[in-house]
Amino acid sequence: RSADMHFSSIELYNYGIYKGLHKIDLVDRIDKKNITLIGGMNGRGKTTILDSILLCLYGRKSAEYITGKKEAYSKLLRDHINKSAVDKSTHIKLTFQMDDDEDTVLSVNRLWNQSGNKIDTTLIVEKNGIADLYLSENWEYYVEELIPFGIAKFFFFDNEKISQIADDDAFDKIKDSIKSVMGVTTI
């Protein structure tokens, strides 16, 4: 049985236009709805929030989708450090609950720091509030089991990405991604 997952919160620190610490609670405690819409004026950070979710979950793999071009991961990270922050460290922390037998709560914390031209990165995954070394070291495999990157972009998108998603060439990728989630393999 596969487990459902529900995002609880996202925390941004010196990420993009978000200077300092910003935490967004994604839990609908009243109606218990499963879809979160983020609205706002142009240039106010909606796309930044969506991109941060993909970056937090998929790291290096998300770079081309976020930027729209083959770009170095370190450049993407450098470009997303808040320009006016004195502290050149940045993090994205995404917390979600699994509807599994144990009601597991996972927090994925992707941190990076700029020192001169060098970018140092760290990934810490917590399970029920405790750092889990195994999950941290194997996160890229674990997250592909939860939501393969190929279909993640169909859940986290904005109007700027719709044309990318609707591209005719993407149809085969969509089929492959759906088969992957369903556990179907073609021989």
Model-identified regions with their sequence ranges:
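A generic structural motif
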Residues: 13-15, 95-99, 103, 124-126
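Conserved P-loop NTP-binding catalytic core
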Residues: 36-41, 50-105
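Short glycine-/polar-rich loops that comprise or flank the Walker A/P-loop
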Residues: 6, 87-92, 116-121, 150-153, ...
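Extended, Lys/Glu-rich alpha-helical coiled-coil stalks
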Residues: 159-187
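Residue-level recognition of well-ordered beta-strand positions that form the cores
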Residues: 11, 93-97, 109-111
